UniProtKB/Swiss-Prot annotation:
Domain of life the protein comes from: Eukaryota
Membrane keyword on record: no
Organism annotation: Rhabdophis tigrinus tigrinus (Tiger keelback snake)
Organism phylogeny: Eukaryota, Metazoa, Chordata, Craniata, Vertebrata
Annotated disulfide bonds: C32-C62, C45-C66, C49-C61, C55-C71
Pfam families: WAP
Protein name: Waprin-Rha1
Range of residues in the leader sequence: 1-24
Family: Belongs to the venom waprin family.
Primary localization: secreted
Length: 76
């Protein structure tokens, strides 16, 4: 019984670790702008995306100055 619980927990942990790898594979080119500045860029204080695939054209899903995720142009 304990072995089953252990294997189930191990499987859940491994699946959780694979989530970031899958989302990174569908990412768009470029990198998110740096929001760790003395005066962070303004942003909509609402999450509008979860992954790059939620954003139009070349935009990426990045943290904004308000701490939420939103579509933005990648930094150059």
């Amino acid at each position: 019984m304990q072995a089953r619980v252990f294997l189930l927990l191990l499987g859940v942990i491994l699946l959780g670790m694979m989530g970031p790898m899958v989302s990174a594979q569908d990412g768009k080119a470029g990198s998110c702008p740096d929001v760790n500045q003395p005066i962070p860029p303004l942003g909509v204080c609402k999450t509008t995306c979860a992954t790059d695939s939620n954003c139009p054209d070349i935009q990426k899903c990045c943290k904004n100055g308000c701490g939420h995720m939103s579509c933005t142009r990648p930094s150059t």
